[in-house]
């Protein structure tokens, strides 16, 4: 646990059961390597570093289980990482992981497998915000003009000040996200992120300021920027090590 004063558990769920067809590779995007390490492992490292997190649930396709097991053996993470068979959709994968959650779970943090530039600080902030309000996400303002369109015709322009582009991590009190997922499944509703499931039940979701560096690696054009960000992270880590010498 996270100290004597914290009696409840904080879980991270990393849905990684997608095929990654937009990347145009036979290898699922979460297992593409950058600096010799799969993207999903880079992401797991951040959650392993986050003091707020007690354990991690990684949702996978059955055919990726062995590959993930090998990577976890190589990494030897300090925190427990549980491999969970995923579903046909992200929402189903998260629901299956929630079914495995221990009874003393307080907060659930859901994060994209291919957002490896999340910081432990962001993870901590999301957990603290969820403790206060019940649900919290990160978002960044839209710098582009956003149009509402139907059949290739503009219906209107949405004011940019009312728009945020949602990111993960998204954190929730356990009972809130569990009920939202259960209700969505019962109603046949498939949301694009977890916060949308809470919204449809009338739940309030706090928005925290996200980061332009917290990119989601989904297509080939994202890879050069990701490599640049990793190089910068390595340089920063080397500078910190020199200062500690």
Residue spans of the language-model regions?
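Conserved core of the sugar-phosphate nucleotidyltransferase
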Residues: 117-208, 245
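Conserved donor nucleotide-binding strand/loop of the catalytic core
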Residues: 75-88
């Amino acid at each position: 646990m996270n100290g004597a004063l914290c009696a409840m558990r904080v879980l991270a769920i990393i849905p990684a059961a997608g095929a990654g067809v937009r990347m145009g590779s036979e290898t699922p995007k979460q297992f593409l390597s950058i600096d010799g390490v799969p993207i999903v492992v880079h992401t797991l490292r951040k959650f392993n570093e986050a003091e707020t997190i007690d354990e991690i649930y990684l949702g996978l396709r059955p055919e990726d289980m062995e590959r993930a097991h090998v990577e976890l053996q190589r990494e030897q993470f300090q925190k427990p990482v549980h491999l969970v068979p995923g579903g046909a959709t992200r929402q189903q994968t998260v629901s299956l992981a929630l079914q495995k959650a221990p009874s003393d779970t307080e907060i659930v943090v859901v994060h994209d497998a291919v957002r490896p530039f999340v910081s432990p600080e962001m993870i901590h902030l999301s957990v603290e915000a969820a403790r206060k309000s019940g649900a919290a996400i990160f978002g960044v303002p839209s710098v582009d003009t956003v149009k509402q369109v139907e059949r290739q015709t503009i219906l209107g322009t949405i004011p940019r000040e009312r728009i945020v582009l949602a990111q993960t991590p998204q954190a929730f009190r356990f009972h809130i996200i569990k009920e939202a997922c259960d209700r969505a499944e019962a109603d046949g509703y498939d949301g694009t992120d977890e916060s949308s499931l809470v919204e449809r039940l009338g739940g309030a979701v706090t928005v925290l300021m996200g980061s332009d560096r917290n990119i989601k690696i989904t297509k080939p054009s994202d890879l050069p920027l990701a490599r640049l960000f990793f190089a910068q992270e390595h340089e920063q880590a080397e500078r910190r090590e020199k200062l500690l010498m």
